[in-house]
Amino acid sequence: GIQIINGGFLTTVQDMGRYGYQETGMSVSGVMDTRAASLANILVGNDTNEAVIEITMMGPTMKFTEDEIIAVTGGDLGAKIDGKPVERYRAVLVKAGQTLSFMGMYGGSRAYIAFAGGLDIPVVMGSRSTNLKSKVGGYEGRKLGTGDEIAFRAPASWLPHMAERVYGLPSYGAKEWTLRVVMGPQDDCFTDKGINTFLNSTYTISNEY
């Protein structure tokens, strides 16, 4: 399994989410970047809904207690194994005793680690996702911290076609996006001209208020 040496800023166990309980007030939770998480699982031979570790901004440091094949996808948070850079979107063998760490935020804000065979995390209401607000799912319903240990369900030190288990760094599309807008209950407070201007204008996102 893995031993958490440092939990980082916000590191949780997530899968594709907990569906069917919204009417009781339980949110779906799940990974923020479904594409990156799915690709990580595919690279190590898992089902795409298998639980992964989701890392936000400043990543964790973890020690492996047994051999395991992993894949790191998503943003570039400076993943290293024993100080050597890890290629993202590739299946990689981590040996027992080695340490996986994340050294910074170089591109993107979230990264994902998939583990061949999955993590030994209990299923709660059909999902292994962590719901921090409700303290449900994942690892004791909370983010990972120093001293936490998670076992692997079916670790693998070898997978067929290892050299081919790689996916080129994906493009997340053009710089311009067309957004879908749903009109609200007060849309009749605006003129037709105003609504037309709103729907057909170009907007720029910035860090200015």
Regions found by a protein language model. Give the residues of each.
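Conserved "landmark" site that anchors the functional core of diverse proteins
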Residues: 1-209
